[in-house]
Amino acid sequence: MSGDKKSRSVIYKKTSRDKAVSVYLGKRDYVDHIESVDPVDGVVFVDPDLLKGKKVYVTLTCAFRYGNEDIDVIGLTFRKDLFFARIQVYPPVEDVKCLTKVQERLMKKLGNNAYPFVMAFPDYLPCSVSLQPAMSDVNKACGVDFEIKAFSASNLEDRYHKKNSVRLLIRKIQYAPDQPGPTPRAETSWQFFMSDKPLHLTASLAKEVFYHGETITVAVTVTNNSEKTVKKISTSVEQTANVVLYSSDFYTKTVAFDESDEKVSPKSTYKHTFTLLPLLAYNREKREIALDGKLKHEDTNLASSTLLKEGIDRTVMGILVDYKIKVTLTVSGLLGDMTSSEVSTELPFILMHPKPDSGAKESEQEEDFVFEDFARDHLKDELQPEEKEEEEEDEK
């Protein structure tokens, strides 16, 4: 019974205000596989009568936003394009050689006025990431986003109007690697003044890759052969966001914390397993925490670790995210509790989403299309100042 039912495939659609151009995409998330990136493959449907001889172009833009775009300071906008590509879709300049199954079925369904396009990502672009603003700065966005735009114009020199264009936000994302690296483990010793033997610390994780929402356990062993007393042991998950634009800035934030007040006396050993759960839900009020890019007003999560292709410079513009476990020992000083000091070690790890089940990939059998409109209201706050002016003029 259920086997006779066709599966349903969501197609994302958006139409220009003048109804002359519509864009259809089979997905909104495009996966960076490290060695390659899924191209943006879509279809543009045109109404030649409404176009009145105009051409239709499609652009792919990666932009870094770092402020409130409503404010224009002496002609400077708070946006920098990291990548821009443009192709002419109508009239077609060249045929798309290899159509995807979704493109083939869309063109068959839409008819003769449907034209396919393919836009490729270069391998050096960052993924979709944003920094969490303060509660009072909700409109001051800072992050990397990607946009597909289609517009009609007589020629590229002419300024097109908002009503003649379609804008769709998409995401570039990564999933956890298939082959994780070695299990993180750190061993270190400290030699203190007036102590013949050192304080030894061993910390390890169960694996290198953890998924969002998964509990992280940290096994800690303290062998105290010194004359000092370890008063406290703490563990934390540290997120480091390397924001590279005009300079390279680092933002390190603690996103999970656990500690033990168990004292480790001289000439003794202590073992303990700490539990950490890095979640955005516990960090809603912390400013400048890196988050995965989001579409519309849906919820998101802490940013995933950034994986770079071998040979790619880490100074590429964007936001690069790393995670580490920090284990800190608070040790008594010469005057006891009055002059305590801290020593620590670190364990890098990867925090990402698991790769979806391969069974969720495009099926060989035909699927029913379900068309979902890109909501224009959700993008209204993303417009640049000059585009908002055009929109207001168009609505008059």
Curated annotation (Swiss-Prot):
SUPFAM superfamilies named in the record: E set domains
Organism expressing this protein natively: Lithobates pipiens
Paired cysteines (S-S): none
Family: Belongs to the arrestin family.
Protein name: S-arrestin
UniProt-listed GO biological process terms: G protein-coupled receptor internalization; signal transduction; visual perception
Classification of source organism: Eukaryota, Metazoa, Chordata, Craniata, Vertebrata
One GO location term (cellular component): photoreceptor outer segment
InterPro entries: Arrestin, Arrestin-like_C, Arrestin-like_N, Arrestin_C-like, Arrestin_CS, Arrestin_N, Ig_E-set
